[in-house]
């Protein structure tokens, strides 16, 4: 592994990142990730969800690569990967449909792993895990530190107390758990500090409010 690939990467100020990723988590925006030449997530055996409203993406993805998404309404589809775990739209290390890529790709941000402390030990995700370890958030003041601690507390709760929550509430994938922790972190805040008395029903309520009537675990 080259020194450049192991070098730390600036992830930005934590509160700034959290304010930007929030809308992406809720499906209301996209993530602005300084990927550089990294394409780890495109080579990590991810199934890519494409919603029926994503007409631009659907127009640029070969229909033969799409198949109905199990458990979702008609019109929701998935795109798979090749025998090496690579997205079929990845050509010579670059996304061939970048300007028209699906929402799943536009909202993916591997900094969620650095933010939450969630580790993806799936062997097919080693490239993503390696890249995620390089990110370093800037904590300029107490607000940054408290918010970061709240996000990590949410992630720890979803892992350590999953048995206290209804079955299937917590996603089975590391990406899903990390994203969910970001989405519900406010439940772990009170009076400018991290709570240590959060109850399961509060977490369930926060998850329900975040997901709405239908919100697929896209990764």
Language model regions located:
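Short loop/turn segments that flank or connect secondary-structure elements
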Residues: 1-219
């Amino acid at each position: 592994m080259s020194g450049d690939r192991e070098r730390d990467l600036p992830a930005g100020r934590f509160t700034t990142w959290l304010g930007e990723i929030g809308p992406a988590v809720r499906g209301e925006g996209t993530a602005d990730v300084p990927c550089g030449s990294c394409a780890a997530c495109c080579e990590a055996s991810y199934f890519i969800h494409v919603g029926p409203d994503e007409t631009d993406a659907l127009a640029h993805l070969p229909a033969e690569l799409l198949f109905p998404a199990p458990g979702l309404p008609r019109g929701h589809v998935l795109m798979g990967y090749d025998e090496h775990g690579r997205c079929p739209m990845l050509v010579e290390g670059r996304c061939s449909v970048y300007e028209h890529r699906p929402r799943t790709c536009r909202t993916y941000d591997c900094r969620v792993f650095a933010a939450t402390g969630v580790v993806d030990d799936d062997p097919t995700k080693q490239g993503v895990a390696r890249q995620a370890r390089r990110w370093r958030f800037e904590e300029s003041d107490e607000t940054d530190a408290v918010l970061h601690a709240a996000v990590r507390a949410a992630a720890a709760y979803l892992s350590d107390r999953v048995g206290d929550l209804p079955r299937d509430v917590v996603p089975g994938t590391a990406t899903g758990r990390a994203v969910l922790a970001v989405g519900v972190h406010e439940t772990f805040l009170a009076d400018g500090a991290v709570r240590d008395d959060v109850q399961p029903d509060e977490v369930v309520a926060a998850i329900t409010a975040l997901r709405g009537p239908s919100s697929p675990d896209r990764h």
